[in-house]
A protein has these predicted regions:
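Polar, enzyme-active/binding microenvironments
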Residues: 1-179
Length: 179
């Protein structure tokens, strides 16, 4: 996905070389089913297990599609509970957590977990946050930076840590960041 300059369904794979004979390189992969930008991935995956959620289809709307990658193709699975763009994610294909983002008209605080086939409501962020960085292995996750509702879009310099079903304040980033 992405914008190049139009919305595409391109996918690229990175093949990591482990010896001096074969160099690491990017290669074209199979196209995603719905071309879009601003989608979430869960940050942790493998060459045979990826997950993308939501996105924007061009001048069109924000969508709630979920697609899984099996190493050779993308398959649409259970839709995310709401339309979503620029959220944050953590986990793997069969145990993911997506939180925050925007539905295209307002920022979100919702958090949802994915079990490999369907989404379940999870713990919401204390403040709606989008275009931040999510990482971790669900159900433990961290949110660093991002933007909260307001105009112009501010960058935030805090981290939130999610464990045991609740979000707690983490350390501060030295510089505010978003995207």
């Amino acid at each position: 996905g992405g914008t190049a300059p139009a919305i595409t369904s391109n996918c690229f794979e990175y093949n990591f070389g482990i010896n001096t004979i074969t160099n690491a390189a990017w290669a074209s992969g199979p196209s995603i089913n719905t071309g879009r930008r601003g989608m979430q991935n869960t940050g942790i995956g493998s060459a045979t297990a990826g997950l993308i959620v939501g996105g924007v289809t061009g001048p069109g709307p924000t969508v709630n599609k979920t697609e899984e990658y099996d190493g050779s193709s993308w398959t649409e699975t259970g839709n995310y509970p709401t339309n979503l763009q620029n959220g944050q994610g953590a986990g793997i294909q069969t145990a993911a957590y997506v939180f925050g983002g925007s539905d295209g008209s307002s920022e979100l605080s919702a958090g949802n977990t994915y079990d490999g086939s369907s989404w379940t409501s999870g713990t919401a962020l204390p403040t709606a946050t989008w275009i931040g960085c999510g990482a971790g292995t669900a159900p433990t996750a961290i949110l660093a930076g991002g933007a909260t509702p307001g105009s112009p879009t501010p960058s935030i310099a805090t981290t939130l840590e999610h464990a045991s079903g609740s979000w707690t304040a983490g350390g501060s980033l030295s510089t505010a960041r978003r995207y």
